[in-house]
Amino acid sequence: MRILIANDDGVTAPGIAALYDALADHADCVVIAPDQDKSGASSSLTLERPLHPQRLDNGFISLNGTPTDCVHLGLNGLLEELPDMVVSGINLGANLGDDVLYSGTVAAAIEGRFLKGPAFAFSLVSRLTDNLPTAMHFARLLVSAHERLAVPPRTVLNVNIPNLPLDRVRGIQLTRLGHRARAAAPVKVVNPRGKEGYWIAAAGDAEDGGPGTDFHAVMQGYVSITPLQLDRTFHEAFGGLDEWLGGLT
């Protein structure tokens, strides 16, 4: 099995090295990742300048682009052999609920949707590395068992691992995405020359985080697995829209 590994924290981030170490004994792994932190890049592509891959001493490929650029380039010409699946992470920080709309970690996995295997996005619910071994364990466990998984084509599995030692994790739960409340207001700053600027503030707290959600699972000490689909069509709105459009003609 051949796996393309990517992330959004950057090619030198500890999480991607941990993911490679977790999977390299079970698969032929190649790493293509951004040359700097691209958290929050979502599915953006770089279109205004060329991309320049650079192979590092450890064999990883660094790219001056986004997480989606990395996977897109890997699947469309940079790699001589097409991988079987894309695995993204291990992100240091949660990708729960609405986070998936902004996450470069999830976006990198989504870009691997055309491959025959399901794509995985792994996130440790912490900015610290103490419990990276826990995330490594579950990444190895889930990816190595993917061939027994029967899911529709183009399924992306968003996996969040609680910030706990392995012996304190209570198990794995299948979940839906929760929802966050509105984010905090951007923080206004003024530089010494009087020019105003803004820092994006923290994401909102869980507004819909009850039982069955990814938020609830990790808070209770479980690994959360949420299957994501790419059809963003809001089918339940069709009836109201049909009636509305009928009144316009």
Curated annotation (Swiss-Prot):
The keyword Phosphoprotein does not apply. A divalent metal cation binds at D8, D9, S39, N91. Its cofactor is a divalent metal cation. Its main location: cytoplasm. It is an enzyme of class 3 (hydrolase). Its EC number is 3.1.3.5. Keywords: Cytoplasm, Hydrolase, Metal-binding, Nucleotide-binding. GO terms for molecular function: 3'-nucleotidase activity; 5'-nucleotidase activity; exopolyphosphatase activity; metal ion binding; nucleotide binding. Belongs to the SurE nucleotidase family. Nucleotidase that shows phosphatase activity on nucleoside 5'-monophosphates. This is 5'-nucleotidase SurE. It comes from Pseudomonas aeruginosa (strain LESB58).
